[in-house]
Amino acid sequence: MQFDPPLQPAILLKRYKRFLADVVTPDGRELTLHCPNTGAMTGCAAPGDTVWYSTSDNAKRKYAHTWELTETQQGAVICVNTLRANSLAKEAISAGIIPELSGYNQLKSEVKYGEENSRIDIMLQADDRQNCYIEVKSVTLAEKEYGYFPDAVTTRGQKHLRELMAVAANGDRAVILFAVLHSAIDRFSPAHHIDARYAQLLTEAQDKGVEILAWKAELSTTRMTLNKPIAVVLNPGK
């Protein structure tokens, strides 16, 4: 995925109302950015961090600028735009980068499925194999070398795990793909300390045939690529 035109830098003043952030540009202008992230954004939004933003030419948008990346004062680069995770996953799958998800000739998005009124992020299909249902999650919470999901209690995420378990029980492939969008993360774990129920369900899902993958993105202000598998540790410390 390329940013064209390249992203522009600014210094974060504050994030507020979840969807807005005030920044100051190198030439001293103050801008309000759209923040496409409803999570806690722990460690991703400290005042004084450098943010990188894109600009839309859509005149109907109230806020023309979108917060894409954070460059923390500790040197980490983080993609805070959670909408990018699905696009990165689709690109990586289509390019054959993720071997576990290769061999399919059709890729569909936002397909209705399940018993809880859900839509799957990605469905892969081929004539010679069962359908593959893929739920994509964006990982930006870092503690030491670990990346954690979720960064807040997520009943929606719990629902998705229940739906994936039902898919696996019916004989199709069920995959949860954690897209790691933080340069300092080298392994993934569910956030037991934030949402114990989600962590419990993820372990249960694996036991019932749901495949768990974690892939890390290479991030820059000009392009992003999901290209590196990292270890999944369901119960760190045990």
UniProtKB/Swiss-Prot annotation:
Organism domain of life: Bacteria
CDD domains per the UniProt record, alphabetical: SfsA-like_bacterial (cd22359)
InterPro entries according to UniProt: SfsA, SfsA_C, SfsA_N
A molecular function (GO) term: DNA binding
Pfam families the UniProt entry points to: SfsA, SfsA_N
Cysteine-cysteine disulfides: none
Family of the protein in this entry: Belongs to the SfsA family.
PANTHER family in alphabetical order: SUGAR FERMENTATION STIMULATION PROTEIN A (PTHR30545:SF2)
NCBIfam families referenced in this protein's UniProt entry, alphabetically: sfsA
Protein name: Sugar fermentation stimulation protein homolog
Organism: Klebsiella pneumoniae subsp. pneumoniae (strain ATCC 700721 / MGH 78578)
Gene: sfsA
